[in-house]
Structure formats: structure tokens, C-alpha cells
Amino acid sequence: MTDHALLLVNLGSPASTSVADVRRYLNQFLMDPYVIDLPWPVRRLLVSLVLIKRPEQSAHAYASIWWEEGSPLVVLTRRLQAAMAEHWPHGPVEIAMRYGQPALPDVLARLAAQGVRKVTLAPLYPQFADSTVTTVIEQAKQTVSEHQLPLQMRVLQPFYEHPAYIEALAASARPYLEQGYDHLLLSFHGLPERHLKKLFPKGVKHDLRAADCCHGATAEVSSVCYRGQCLATAKAFAQSMGIPDGKWSVSFQSRLGRDKWIEPYTETRLDELAKAGVKKLLVMCPAFVADCIETLEEIGMRGSEQFVEAGGQELVLVPCLNDHPEWVRVLADMCEKA
């Protein structure tokens, strides 16, 4: 074994579907200042209020999608790890979670103890956001610094419109598209608008409701505009598959709280599409590379029920990339070149 590890990092999951484990997980997740970017006292108060009822509700949702092997997100990420090990000859391939287990600091410490000296850190997020990519990088840096770990790190950058990534999306989705459909909805995880606005250069006024978002903007803006990157992913995918305009659209899911989030909202689009006469709706969730509660339960279960109740006939959830062979090949190549 050589001394260069590949570390795949995903969001995380509760240890089980118990209310106590879900509460512990939600507390860690929501108290991250990159997730809820409010002063600590306000964040603590808000999260404490959320934790009164949300853990029980979320525990029920997790139970509805939990596998015999455990959390789908963790199981699928481990499958990806096993597949990636066949493509990474430089050292061990490990996984870590930003929240929950296996914890990122623990994995970094273990790698250092094993004699690893170089780490390619791969946040498994195609698009950039502080609440996903930045928090992973900062926790890794903090761990290395505080514990004086002898690790050199390089980081896989967001790959939202990398041609090979788009090809992997196409390869995984093609069997579902070939079965026929009325409309394709690409549903990305949403974010509060303020998360994006605070990253824009001072003096830049950017319309987060514009149809083309930051298309044509400077790299300084487009590199931090999550909404624009999602739209770029969707457009590149639709073009690669030859899907005509009007037969696909983009939306944003998982809104939490009363703040203004980026639009359009997935829950709104599901009703609109059903009422517009769409009978068979395909939904892809390209912000996620592994299926999780947001895809399996929020879209595959609740979203499907909502769409049918609004007049649609069938909602088909296209699986995430998971451990699809083309995705494994593409990810290995991107990590090699990181």
C-alpha cells in the first residue's frame, strides 16, 4: 500500500431510525454555521425549537426508506468506496461523513496513524455551496491543524458541468428516459437565497429568479452561484440527451423554515405539471450522487403521492449515480486529476 489515500465525503445519516439518534444527527447538522448561517445564540434557539417536533417526524421518514443493511446513503457510499478501490492504486479508499459516522475527523486521524501522508479529499457534491463543499473542506483543514496530522491534502473541485460527469448522468438515466415520459423534472436541493448572495462580490446585484441565472456572468460570480450551477448541469444533461425545451424543467426541493429560498420550488412544480396534463413524470435529483432520504422519501414517496393527488398518473424517480460503473470510472479519473 502506498501513502496516498482517497477520501470520499458525503453528508451523513443518523445511526438508526430511533428518535434519539435522529435528534442527535439533526442537532449536529443544523448547528453547523455553514448550514444555518446565523449568530450562535440565534442558531441555538432556532435549532432547539426545530428539535421539539422534527426528530420524531424525520425518524418516521427515515424508517420508511431504511434498508436492512442500514442507511441507504451510507450503504450506497460504501458500495461506491468498494468500486473505487479497484480504480485507485495509490493507497486506501475510505469514506467519511460530515455529520454522523464515520466522522471525518476520526477517519483523517486513522489514515495518518496508518502512515498515509497524502489525501485526495473528494466532497461528493457536483455543485458548490458553503453548506456542502466548504464545510467539508474547513472541517478537514481544522482537524489537520488542531491535531497536527502530517497530511497533505488536495481537493476535488465541483464538477457540475464536467463533460464526463454529464456523460455519467446520461448513462445512468438513459434506461428510464427510453421507457417514455411526458416531462422530466430535474429537482436539486434548495438553499436560502442569502447563502448565495453573501458570496457574491461586493456591489454585484444578481437576479436569483432569472431564467438563465448567472449565465454570462463573471467567473467570480458563477463559481459561487449554486443556482446557476444547477441550471448549467440540467441544461448540459438535456442537451446531451437531445431533450427538447419544454419537455424538461428545473426545481429546488427540501425547503426549511420561512426564509426565501431559490426557486422554483419542487412542491409547486409537481402540482403545476400535473395540472398542465403531464401524466408520466420522470424526476432526477442531480445534486445528490447517492440516493438518500431527500430522493427516496421526499421525492419517491411524498412527491409521488402529491403528483398523483394533483392529477398525474405516475412519478418515476430516476436513481442517483450511486455505484453505476460509468460514474465510478468518471469519479476515479476526476480524483486522479484533482
From Swiss-Prot:
Keywords: Cytoplasm, Heme biosynthesis, Iron, Lyase, Metal-binding, Porphyrin biosynthesis. It is an enzyme of class 4 (lyase). Pfam families: Ferrochelatase. It catalyses: heme b + 2 H(+) = protoporphyrin IX + Fe(2+). HAMAP family: Ferrochelatase. Belongs to the ferrochelatase family. Catalyzes the ferrous insertion into protoporphyrin IX. This is Ferrochelatase.
